[in-house]
């Protein structure tokens, strides 16, 4: 402990010396010089601060960081070949600002709104739409570029399991995606390829992987903030057709420039293209989906603005394994599951009305009325598994967010929100009788591994939160402490989340060296009804994580940047399926028996907050930004080393434990005796690397490449089978159930096996045809160019017994096998028109 205190004291002393050795009141403005007549940034423009006689130069987009000794009035002299131009500005504190070098005369009654919120540098990675819209391997989806950022592990696969990302070791379901600060249920459609947001609506994407700001919530993983276009100068549109979907986009200003409307949408037909190719087994109907986004903005004046949003997405997927009556799995890939039925549906609608009031440059208040309607449906019929469930967790909320510039050094963000939750969950709920069973058998009729229970839950609850963040900047030193509190009324439980970010910038080191650190407590409560009093646990708490991290960012030249950051996350109170959690007396979960038997003893709560885990690692990002309007190359190299461990803390009966306990004794032991073992999380990947390259060859062609490398995920090895005790009653096919080690002292127990490493190369070639009305973009995208047979764990064929050839490595999506057995890379061909 003394050593820790000594190191901490030394660290504080170093920070103190660094802080007081630099100018206290220096101010840095992030400026973009923009020519409104040409609607382009002033690239490579030399700017002199007249008072200090210092020179600066903009990049290819007109961006530049300019330093001032203190707050005050300054003159910027723009040095052009046609002669100098002077622009006077008022400097009060560090901020981001747009400077118009030449203004286009606004239409009568037109209003120009400027400004952008300054964001933290710690644990945040920003990508611009221009850099990612044509990235290979993303199938034209800008959101898929998140997979290449440091700290992010892609969820390799195809289908619903591939529509999440792992951020610094967190469960892929624990992230929050926000569209202009509005919730969306899921970011990617069930095909695992396309996002629910149209590309042309995206302005920037920010990934907060560490201790995110207090205005965000409900994530123990990462927060992905999608900022959409905030201005439309002229009528424009886009139309794109590919092998599996069609997208459209249109935007136009109205009311003499006072407002604008932007609309985007997507329709998927993968089931009608790839699904009709004969490359898939009979009975599989690939995902169908659609989405739409509407944004309407109107400025009444410089002080008042209203915005209306409506976001929708709908997905469904189904499998109906044919019952051919043939007991030959070599001819029918789904014979083991013949007669089985499975379907899943996802949808959401987010409708919002937002009013922004800006009475002065020092204060802004935003009120948002939100109606959020997420729906999930599933229907399964397979052996002993018979269930159909519909879940809806709608809420109506009012949110307030304000920003107050108290002084030139102090800004305060604060806000509150109240939601009225209305949940509806009915049907038949399916759960594992033993959630620690790694290989449940759907045809086990002697002692079924699955349990079904009727579900009919309706109710309401209040939810409220409040937050505040103080942004203090004294010269090159920044400190942002914040705190947030969330409370769910139905569980009478809340979560307090303090957090802070600290940074210091050395502007004289190349083009700027910033050292930063961050830490804090974050919380999340799943959008489910696991807290209901009839079949769930009404005492569930928020899932929590404590995040800490630190590193540095170094800029050199106008376009290069290197960023290195280390982190550690500690997860606790994770909600898990718990067959031993119970109350002495509770309502009978079967409502049909309420008249005859309303109360039952030892009523199972089914869920608890016993899950724990932790992750640690470091990230490296080397980046070269693009130069708009130039043919220079751009790209980045990212690398992440990490480890993630998880423990459900659910009691297990191991091999060799033959002592006979009564049910009550077993329940008491399970409550107080934790004998589960911590092991690597199933989504852990030690090494993740990405190399991204883009080059605009000339006005007609652009070439892009992407190489990805990932360590294989850990998995538990199959050590045998159950002898084929059960069979599928639909066709008599014997079902060989895999068997895993249940002895924690053997090498085969737990997630100890890894397969071959994953890597692939993707390329994309774009051809542009320019016309007076716009342009057409033809593109060819090839995934897995060198036909790497990547695997993800192993696959056990239940139609055959355990042997040297069963199980085999599980192939991942990335190649196509033609009927003649020829293997080709997966590819996408499409056309996009912009007008």
Predicted regions and their residues:
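C-terminal beta-signal and adjacent terminal beta-strands/loops
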Residues: 708-741, 755-760, 767-835
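Transmembrane beta-barrel wall of Gram-negative outer-membrane proteins
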Residues: 244-267, 281-320, 342-367, 406-410
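Surface-exposed extracellular loop regions of Gram-negative outer-membrane beta-barrel proteins
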Residues: 323, 375, 427-436, 504-549, ...
